[in-house]
Structures are given as C-alpha cells and as structure tokens.
C-alpha cells in the first residue's frame, strides 16, 4: 500500500500526514524498512513510524541497544521521521508499553470501538502521559452496521485522539469524511 500512496500523493506530500509501520524488531531490519518506506512513499519524511503489533516477548529486543527503537531514534534525529509510535493487539502489552516505555514512544494504536472497550483505562493513562492515542478498528473490522454512530462514539470517547477506519472504496472514504465534517456529540441515550 505504501507504493500506491506514494504514487497518489506525489506532488502533494505537504497536504497529508503520513504514517506507516514495520514488524522489524532489530536495528538492521528497522533501518532497512525506514529506507524502503521512504522510497515507496516517494518522500524524504514520514510523520509517524510505528513498531507494529509489538508483543511483550519482543520488548527487550525492540527497545534494547541493538533494537528497532534505536533505528527509529536515529531516523528521527536525521529528520527522516517525525514521531515514533507502537501498535499493539494485547491489552497487557499496551499497558506495559505505556507504563514502562511511555517516555520513549509518542503514540500508541490499539483496537478500540463501541464494542471493544477493554483498552479504555490504558488509553486514558497514555493521554495523561502525553502519548497520542489512535483507535484501530473503530468500526470493529467492518462488523458494525451503524458506522456513523461508531465513529461518533470514538470522537466522544475522550481517550482517542484519532481513529483510522479501514476504507476499501472511494465511497467509504467520503462516508467517513462526512462524519468528521458533521460531527455532533452523542446523546445520553446513544451513550447508554
């Protein structure tokens, strides 16, 4: 998808915030992935680069001296990336990331939606620590019929700074953008 985005955004890079991710856990792999992403995206700068789906068993490797975090820190110092984030699918991993590595990461991304609320307290803690929070799967992987209500729920949640609904067609892009433009608070009845 990076190659498609690179082609679509060519000449308009400054109008967008670019985020991407890598499964690399070691220094060499992450260094290589950053360079590949820059090339694929046809840019010299990525706004947010994320360690993707980081399980607890990989924390020591990723954040150790020879790990992916060092490569991202160097890329940030060189002006190749703006911010360093992590994504997680396990609540225990998210909690540890925020508590133990919160001074190193600038964003966390975790599944959060109207039916998956387990991350609420940890996302709130992340925000208290100044870590940006991103709602992954705000439409529960496409399983929610009332997408407008689902996106309004995220906007009213007070624990997510942004949500990234998956979109597979221009119509879905327009639909989700319309919710943002017409955003209204949830009523008491809707919250219940």
Across the structure, where does each feature detected by a protein language model lie?
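N-terminal binding-site loop/beta-alpha segment at the start of enzyme catalytic domains
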Residues: 1-16
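Glycine/proline-rich, positively charged
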Residues: 25-121, 127-134
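Hydrophobic packing residues within well-ordered alpha-helices of enzyme cores
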Residues: 5-8, 94-97, 173-176
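Hydrophobic/aromatic residues located in beta-strands of well-ordered beta-sheets
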Residues: 16-18, 84, 133, 163
